[in-house]
């Protein structure tokens, strides 16, 4: 019975409200109170599935009225209202017929009287167990490989329900198949079960698990009706021919047969397997046949499988073949031989009958129809050898023997990819190669006496090694292969390594300050470099070297025996060798050289300079006084010839060039120098007044005492110019040589 409002619930609610209104009007005159309220479950709070359950709500009400008041009773399950009633009775009941799991829950009831309300505590009700499920089948007879649909349901319960369906063989307790499924929206499931080839009479069981909140109630397991299974084809059977002992060489016949019922829609596939190998099969009949000449290789377990869609039936048999003769054995004197050694092979059968035929083969090709083979080995004899022995139709192949004939290596050649010279640090490839000889070939490269690297080559191609030599080095390689001879050494490869020029430096051997006349020695050196090295010496601001030399040395010297001021300046040098890139000379530092004079030379030069200065001064002074003297005499001679002043020896008396008697204020040396110039030298017209002044000069005689005096009269010409012009005068002076 569903716990919810009926469709007439609204009507009942109206009636209850009306009754409550009336009660309230009456209550204005009477007093009411709810003393207590509680619930009772009959037969109890725990009931079994399918039992009836009664819910009672018991109310104790007190009133001043002589008539019992009408009150409202409401029933709740898990806080959801499912039933209400108006009553004047103290007890109201709600009946549940055949309680199920979903009726489990927490119940309570509420009483409403006028505006007063009281609710009971919650009462937990548990319905234990699940009603038994129902199992139905879509058929009770089925053919092998068919499908049976099984439906399991619990109509009385509400979902979700978890169903477990199991398949059993009749009278067998073990479960053949088990399947589970949960129905979330219904209380039944339908599952399909395939009928297998071993099934004869089968049945199914069903169990329902009802999930309610956190609780799960499990039903009893209910079995279905029996299902009869019919065969679509029989189990396969083997037929072996010949019967009894089968000897190698006999024709072996293996046949697998089945019987197909009329209910089968088509023939199944029949497969014969030797171990896992399929040797015969058939799809259009009731048998499959495998026929072959018997050998011991056919000793095996044979399986016959019959398969049709979902059905597979299997049968097995062991077939034994008696050996006619043993497998031949091939042996050799050695498996690795040097070229030219003797190769011997022999084939044998333990207890072989005389009629056995032998053939020795190499790589599947016949070499000799005999039991033994002897020959001188060559490299082309390398390969895989077998022996074939036959008696009648039975042919057997021996084990394989791998023969390797090794040709001796030729002397290996050694070479590298660069020229005769290698620049330091450059990677070179050194190759070793033996033209003749059996591969694989093992090469070892020696650098000096040390092993540099090893390499295995699977052909006669050269082995290539890489190295970065930093100095002159010798390489040698050793080649070896399978031959018993020791490793074959090559000739020695000598590689000359050229070190590029590094760190060019220019220095002076004595001092950067050189005394004039002493030697200058410049040294251009390199830290490292292979000769010959070209050195070029430069003076700064000069495009061409003043000295160039090529040496097999890491230094070069330029020597100047006697230095002069011309050698003073800044110097640098360039150096290069064959390892230097084209036009890429390395430049040194710049060196400043100063040339100074020797002290004695400085003194000599000073003396010479002083002497020259003195000489120049003397010459200048003499020239000056001579010029001055001429300037004094020249105007007098132009006026009249003056009588020479004679001393006591009748010699002319000359004025002392150092005297200052004739130099007086107004004297113009230029006038004296130019006294010979004509008057019309000046282009402008001049008005001149000429006066003559008598000058008496007294000069002492150099060879007489100061008391002796001489007098000379000199006439000077005085020209007067216009006032605008400069006035030149020649004053008349009288004096004596003694200055008085």
Swiss-Prot record:
Encoding gene (name): PECAM1
Entry membrane topology: Single-pass type I membrane protein
Extracellular topological domain: 28-602
Molecular function in Gene Ontology: transmembrane signaling receptor activity
Region (Disordered): 697-740
PTM per Swiss-Prot/TrEMBL: Phosphorylated on Ser and Tyr residues by src kinases after cellular activation. Upon activation, phosphorylated on Ser-731 which probably initiates the dissociation of the membrane-interaction segment (residues 711-731) from the cell membrane allowing the sequential phosphorylation of Tyr-715 and Tyr-692. Constitutively phosphorylated on Ser-736 in resting platelets. Phosphorylated on tyrosine residues by FER and FES in response to FCER1 activation. In endothelial cells Fyn mediates mechanical-force (stretch or pull) induced tyrosine phosphorylation. Palmitoylation by ZDHHC21 is necessary for cell surface expression in endothelial cells and enrichment in membrane rafts.
The protein's name: Platelet endothelial cell adhesion molecule
PTM-bearing positions, type Phosphoserine: 731, 736
UniProt free text on domains: The Ig-like C2-type domains 2 and 3 contribute to formation of the complex with BDKRB2 and in regulation of its activity.
List of glycosylated residues: 52, 84, 284, 301, 320, 357, 372, 436, 456, 552
Biased composition (Basic and acidic residues): 717-732
Disulfide bonds: 57-109, 152-206, 256-304, 347-387, 432-477, 524-573
Residue window of motif ITIM motif 1: 690-695
SUPFAM superfamilies listed in its UniProt record: Immunoglobulin
Cytoplasmic side: 622-740
Species this protein is from: Sus scrofa (Pig)
GO annotation, cellular component aspect: anchoring junction; external side of plasma membrane; membrane raft
Complexes and interactors: Trans-homodimer (via Ig-like C2-type 1 and Ig-like C2-type 2 domains); trans-homodimerization is required for cell-cell interaction. Forms a complex with BDKRB2 and GNAQ. Interacts with BDKRB2 and GNAQ. Interacts with PTPN11; Tyr-715 is critical for PTPN11 recruitment. Interacts with FER. Interacts with CD177; the interaction is Ca(2+)-dependent; the interaction is direct.
Cleavable signal peptide: 1-27
Transmembrane segments: 603-621
Domain Ig-like C2-type positions: 35-126, 145-223, 236-315, 328-404, 425-494, 500-592
Residue numbers carrying Phosphotyrosine: 692, 715
Subcellular localization, as worded in the UniProt entry: Cell membrane; Membrane raft; Cell junction
Region ranges (May play a role in cytoprotective signaling): 723-740
Keyword vocabulary terms for this entry: Cell adhesion, Cell junction, Cell membrane, Disulfide bond, Glycoprotein, Immunoglobulin domain, Membrane, Phosphoprotein, Repeat, Signal, Transmembrane, Transmembrane helix
